[in-house]
């Protein structure tokens, strides 16, 4: 069976846990390049434990196809919560993924 998110965190030596992606926009429809931001949900993981909230948001520029190709682990599919409570239509089911080389293009303070 697929790993839970907790199992995946427990198996992480050092990394970032991203729990919310926001303001996702299309950059190049031919390659499906998207840009977006992390928001209110970036955590530092060290030695299998979430040790701190990261006080920054990050911008990414990636194709979801490339992200799936780069994933080294995919966990059990879970129903996600909407960013805003009134956004009931944006609920989806998605698995957590480990993507070791996911690069962020810029950083900004989260507050």
Kindly give the residue locations of the regions a language model identified.
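Dual-mode signal for accessory low-complexity, basic/Gly-rich regions
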Residues: 1-111
